[in-house]
From Swiss-Prot:
Protein name as annotated: Cytochrome b
Variant or mutagenesis effect after changing residue 360 to S: In strain: Isolate TK 86578
Protein's organism: Glossophaga soricina
Quaternary structure annotation from Swiss-Prot or TrEMBL: The cytochrome bc1 complex contains 11 subunits: 3 respiratory subunits (MT-CYB, CYC1 and UQCRFS1), 2 core proteins (UQCRC1 and UQCRC2) and 6 low-molecular weight proteins (UQCRH/QCR6, UQCRB/QCR7, UQCRQ/QCR8, UQCR10/QCR9, UQCR11/QCR10 and a cleavage product of UQCRFS1). This cytochrome bc1 complex then forms a dimer.
Source taxon at top rank: Eukaryota
Length: 379
């Protein structure tokens, strides 16, 4: 008799995706981050659902409702800090996942890669709207500054900002709609994840060598399920340690002050995972130029497949490209640090230099070095 997992209409889909899926035998731990992102999304949806049961999206009560969750709701503080630090874990896994794709040339699967970029934008939008909900000082001013950037769009900018705000400033209408969208977006993200996996399973996974692995495949279960479970345990242990020992490590102390439109914080900054893009935005003195640079800092990923000039797919056997890749990582760390510093000398000039190097490395240095490596292959 045929196994039910191979005949049942629903189980058949699960089976072909997670059990009998042929996977390359050489996948390293860098391939764990996709499944870790799935766990992060599940944790965020679950904790978010329970938080939404106690949260009120009204400017008069939002801040107090978060305080109420932490003080009066059973294990409310665990829910709140799991959700806040879960977002940080989400972005750590996201950036490592994208970095792995860049390093091993996974971007040559253009459909999967482009859906991934859409996912990145959707998760960033979700996180931004979520940061506004506690209605602390940094929530309010972060929302004001970031939404106000849209006013740089010629002709329709000002109308667009007022349309998003639902008035002439960030107020009750803004908070209510941000809560509605913050609740909705994770489910859109979950749907996009399905499409992401659909396209991935059309082509099969890449592997560290970048060489087709059709001749050397193993079943996903039990080999990679066990490996993924180990990843889950490590990540959930790290998240638990962060939540239980230093829950405010990655947060901003200003957000423990209720939102006050009459008092601007000394330094408005977003959460740490947006600081690199924020530094690029601030490094350009022109408002429209800054907004374009901000969007392009992420959108540049979409043209990476077109800039692939190497004869080899992966960077595994390309030492010069490896050096440039780690140089790019160092630039991103520098930008993240600069984004958290005040706008003054020498931080301004360091941010500008790092921003220029970020775009130059991706657009010019990497394609040129790849061409050079092609010539070295002929020696």
């Amino acid at each position: 008799m045929t196994n039910i997992r191979k005949t049942h209409p629903l189980l058949k889909i699960v089976n072909s995706s997670f059990v009998d899926l042929p996977a390359p035998s050489s996948l390293s731990s860098w391939w764990n981050f996709g499944s870790l992102l799935g766990v992060c999304l599940a944790v965020q949806i679950l904790t978010g659902l329970f938080l939404a049961m106690h949260y009120t999206s009204d400017t008069a009560t939002a801040f107090n409702s978060v305080t109420h969750i932490c003080r009066d709701v059973n294990y409310g503080w665990v829910l709140r800090y799991l959700h806040a630090n879960g977002a940080s874990m989400f972005f750590i896994c996201l950036y490592l996942h994208v970095g792995r794709g860049l390093y091993y040339g996974s971007y040559t699967y253009s459909e999967t890669w482009n859906i991934g970029i859409l996912l990145l934008f959707a998760v960033m939008a979700t996180a931004f709207m979520g940061y506004v909900l506690p209605w602390g000082q940094m929530s309010f001013w972060g929302a004001t500054v970031i939404t106000n950037l849209l006013s740089a769009i010629p002709y329709i900018g000002t109308d667009l900002v007022q349309w998003i705000w639902g008035g002439f400033s960030v107020d009750k209408a803004t908070l209510t709609r941000f809560f509605a969208f913050h609740f909705l977006f994770p489910f859109i993200v979950a749907a996009l994840v399905m499409v992401h996996l659909l396209f991935l399973h059309e082509t099969g996974s890449n592997n560290p060598t970048g060489i087709p692995s059709d001749s050397d495949m193993i079943p996903f279960h039990p080999y990679y399920t066990i490996k993924d479970i180990l990843g889950f345990l490590i990540m959930l242990t790290a998240l638990s340690a962060l939540v239980l020992f230093s829950p405010d490590l990655l947060g901003d102390p200003d957000n423990y002050m209720p939102a006050n439109p009459l008092n601007t914080p000394p330094h408005i900054k977003p959460e740490w995972y947006f600081l690199f893009a924020y530094a690029i935005l601030r490094s350009i003195p022109n408002k429209l130029g800054g907004v374009l640079a901000l969007v392009l800092s992420i959108l540049i990923l979409a043209i990476v497949p077109m800039l692939h000039t190497s004869k080899q797919r992966s960077m595994m056997f390309r030492p010069l490209s490896q050096c440039l890749f780690w140089f790019l990582v160092a630039i991103l760390f520098t930008l993240t640090w600069i984004g958290g510093q005040p706008v003054e000398y020498p931080y301004i000039i360091i941010g500008q230099m790092a921003s220029v190097l970020y775009f130059l490395t991706i657009l010019v240095f990497m394609p040129l070095v790849s061409i050079m490596e092609n010539y070295l292959l002929k020696w």
